[in-house]
Amino acid sequence: MPVVGIKQVVDAELEGRSNTFNFRKNPSQVTTQGLWFDLALSPGNPVPKYWFGTPLQATVISQSLDGGLFHGSDVSPSKKYLRDTTFSSTSATGLPMPLVLMDYLMYYPLIDEGTTDEQFMDNTNTLTRYTDGEGVQVMAVSVAGRTGGQSFFINYTNQDGVSGRISQNVIENTSAALGVVVTSATATNANSCLFIPLQDGDTGVRSIESVTMLGTDVGLFSLVLVKPLVSTVLLEQTAPVKKDYLTESSNLPEIKPDAFLNLVCLPNGALNATGILIDMKVIWSD
């Protein structure tokens, strides 16, 4: 049965239906205060996942093919849940620092910032998890540096299967760091977004149809479809932050089969030469 309450959680742990995994990410990029950063591209354990591939072609992301934070093998027909997480840092430089753990679903590589022509996506591949798109968000991750300051928008299909939806215009920041979320800059009203704001009334994305730059630059970014699962804030080096999802939230986040898990963070300074340590416990239903 699904894990839905205290008894089911206790039974899962007593019966050995649990596992704990440990990770360490070591960013090599000089991150900037107030700019969201995708730790999936950083060295460490797990190894980096770079958002390269055939330009503009929808590419499915999975644990079996791409790695990510390993959460164990498929337990189907049982369901797997995130029991708790603990985060810590080897340096105080980038703290306090919000973190978001997400399921990375699909990406569109190498959007060219050097043209204002509409760039059409190849959607031969489709979502394999959260297939209705509900709650699925889009982030633009830098894979080649830019001058910054240009705007763009996306044309997408929403959670109801309605195509031709148009996002709000977003402005790129000026960071040259690979892995930075190009639309983020918390000190600037116009481009403070981790995720690209959708058209009013929409709550998710099934696919991206096209991207249009409103001015040219020299960089490249990839669009990544993600499903946020949990968030926390690491406040200081001497105090690891643990979150128990049984006692501190209304439900245990489900980890879908073959999910690619990884993190984004909002550092308060440079993270290069900093180790970010992650402990993660999962349980599964009987």
Annotate each language-model stretch with its function:
Residues M1-D286:
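Polar, enzyme-active/binding microenvironments
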